[in-house]
């Protein structure tokens, strides 16, 4: 929880005074943090932390909607990373880290016009 929840909360708290009308905070979560999604053994701490980040972002969206600061969450599915390789040896994810980074970058710049307080599941496969 130290990195996946508490660090996100602390960084967000520190940045709030610098955010202006129209700002967009995008938090990265995981499909494992989505209630009702497929769960995998050995990922209890990770998945529950990602669920906590989802709830945090939903609450912040409500708290800062009057200031027109958007908070959204991208719950990522399988992306080819070292962590995925360790958790699922031999599995080939359909997306590279670079492809996902491009998606996150573009979402961050424009999606506050369309979303606030939303959790978007970004997955073309399982896990």
Located regions from the model:
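Catalytic Tyr-X3-Lys loop
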Residues: 1-10, 26, 53
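Hydrophobic positions on the long internal alpha-helix
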Residues: 7, 11-15, 19, 56-57, ...
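Short coil/turn segments at alpha/beta junctions that flank glycine-rich nucleotide-binding fingerprints
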Residues: 18-22, 63-69, 111
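Catalytic loop of short-chain dehydrogenase/reductase
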Residues: 24-52, 57-58, 62-66, 78
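Hydrophobic structural elements of the Rossmann-like NAD(P)H-binding subdomain
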Residues: 26, 71-74, 84
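Conserved Rossmann-fold SDR core element
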Residues: 54, 64-79, 114-122
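C-terminal helical subdomain
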Residues: 73, 89-127
